[in-house]
Amino acid sequence: MTIKAAIFDLDGTLVSLPIDYRALYAEFRKTMGIQDIEPITKTVAALNEALRGKVFETWTMAESAILPKITIVKEGTELYEQYSEIPKALVTMQGKKTVERILSTLTLSFQVVITREDSLDRAAQITLALEKLRLKPENVIVIGDRETDKAAAEKVGCKFKMVKK
């Protein structure tokens, strides 16, 4: 099948965000009032809207603090260039404000952007991107840096390319 679109992950694939997750998770534990918060995406998804909003606010503040320290992932940006002639989507667990700030400073653009505010489940994020791109999964490649990205792409039926760290 012909590749008609590429879906990229952000952190670890196109850029590296040096977030101190140990400190961030400690803040999450305080905010949520529970100790067992992993897997974080499932825990946050199960929260009521008000508490999830507080967690997202804390998360966005942590992301904003490290934005001056982000670095480019060479292999990921080379793949971005390789797929420059086809539509591209971005799926990320970063927040909308963070993504807007990152994309405004880099020369990267996407027809579709799906953030944690849209879904905290990677397979659901990919499915949303496919719907917005109006493409079948077998015509799309997902590019990510984690086994969870690969599993989500395969679950949805997309091809997958791993960016090495």
Protein language model regions, located:
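Short, basic/glycine-rich phosphate-binding loops at helix/coil junctions
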Residues: 51-63, 107-112
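Acidic, divalent-metal-coordinating active-site segment for phosphoryl/phosphodiester hydrolysis
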Residues: 145-161
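Structural beta-sheet core signal
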Residues: 89-92, 142, 162
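Substrate-recognition "cap/lid" segment bordering the active-site pocket of phosphatases
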Residues: 96-141, 147-151
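Short, acidic loop-to-helix structural element flanking the phosphoryl-transfer center
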Residues: 65-100, 104, 123-124
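Active-site neighborhood of HAD-like aspartate-dependent phosphohydrolases
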Residues: 1-42
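Glycine-rich phosphate-binding loop signature in dinucleotide/nucleotide-binding domains
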Residues: 1, 84-86, 133-139
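Short, structured coil segments at secondary-structure junctions
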Residues: 84, 106-109, 155-158
